[in-house]
Amino acid sequence: MFSSTTLHHLPRPNLLLPRKVISRRMSTNPAIEPKVRKFESVEGVDIGSRNKSDGFFAIPLYLSKLVALYNCISLSRIGTSNENFVFSGIRFRLVSYNILAQVYVKSALLPHSPPACLKWKARSHAILSVLKNLQADFFCLQEVDEYDSFYRNNMDSLGYSGIYIQRTGQRKRDGCAIFYKPSCAELVTKERIEYNDLVDSIKADSVSCSEQKIETSNEGKDSRKDSRDLNDPLVRLKRDCVGIMAAFRINKPFQHIVIVANTHLYWDPELADVKLAQAKYLLSRLAQFKTLISDEFECTPSLLLAGDFNSIPGDMVYSYLVSGNAKPTETIEEEEAPVPLSSVYEVTRGEPKFTNCTPGFTNTLDYIFISPSDFIKPVSILQLPEPDSPDVVGFLPNHHHPSDHLPIGAEFEIRRE
């Protein structure tokens, strides 16, 4: 709707024109005009990890800058007639974005958002516009609920192939998708991650004990079958959350293999232990997958993990992912994490002030993690708005952002093994 402050700036409509023509002309303005920011260079910034098992060792900043300068010179020489020239690296871009499933878009839940910005037609076109403008080689998307009916074909028209996993609950319609450019990478293999498997592991570990404790009704049925008691771990852990991981062979010049994982952990802050259990299961699966790829292809794959972790910097999940210790403030022996990780934003420019922006909650929930190695480094990151930026004032979604989350992204350079 037009406010009283903007109406007097509009040209006076021609009252002789048919009403339908006027309506058509006024509707040409989209409800959402996406605001997409640029990537900024972080070359020369060293990243590290408490675990150096992948062969990563920090080098002095001045040496990093010399390496970056050499790479820039090398890249500029591609295509020259010098046959002795050796290509030093190849770059690709990864973006993670919780696009807000349309099934969760209700005016009652988002009263701060302009109604026109919540309509599927406006949002879907705006999301596609954002993705197109970001020009990533990989997209890790969460809350994808129209994969077959909308995203698969539309992303295909933009030059992307996709893999997808839907949430496991019967009434859950959204899931996680990884879209990638076949011109950049070849899909080698993939695996699903279903966090409800945690329930099965508990059942397997305690089946004999459970058989003794479970009371049955007069009909002989399991009285816990329909239980909603969150004190019951079989109920507490069944949150229908999922993830997906895949190995990609980066095309020319030296076909390095990169593992890309995308996930969406449970949201409820009251179930922090559930989110931590999911994070631990995630890293254990990633470690197994990485070993599988290493053995099968006799290589050292790089690993990138992205998604909506529903965890703020410094909480148990975040601390576990970057240090292996869920409670860093306590003087306890660290638990060895299966995969060493560093947050790309944290080790370059610091975590964003927020990636989720609503009246009830504004903070950082989305991350891109990297397992540090000699073979891959971040060279740029996607800029994010400040809290007082005009395009986020009034919270999200709005006329500039089709989701309540912001996209995050990074560009990486792979060097020859």
From Swiss-Prot:
Protein's GO biological process: nuclear-transcribed mRNA poly(A) tail shortening; regulation of circadian rhythm; rhythmic process
Coiled coil: none
Pfam name, any one: Exo_endo_phos
Effect of pH on activity: Optimum pH is 6.5.
Localization annotation: Nucleus; Cytoplasm
Family: Belongs to the CCR4/nocturin family.
Other remarks in the entry: Plants overexpressing CCR4-4 exhibit retarded growth phenotype and severe reduction in root length that is attenuated over time.
Protein role: Acts as a catalytic component of the CCR4-NOT core complex, which in the nucleus seems to be a general transcription factor, and in the cytoplasm the major mRNA deadenylase involved in mRNA turnover. Transcriptional regulator of circadian rhythms with poly(A)-degrading activity that affects the expression and rhythmicity of the clock core oscillator genes TOC1 and CCA1. Deadenylation may be a mechanism involved in the regulation of the circadian clock. May play a negative role in response against oxidative stress.
Protein name: Carbon catabolite repressor protein 4 homolog 4
UniProt lineage: Eukaryota, Viridiplantae, Streptophyta, Embryophyta, Tracheophyta
Gene: CCR4-4
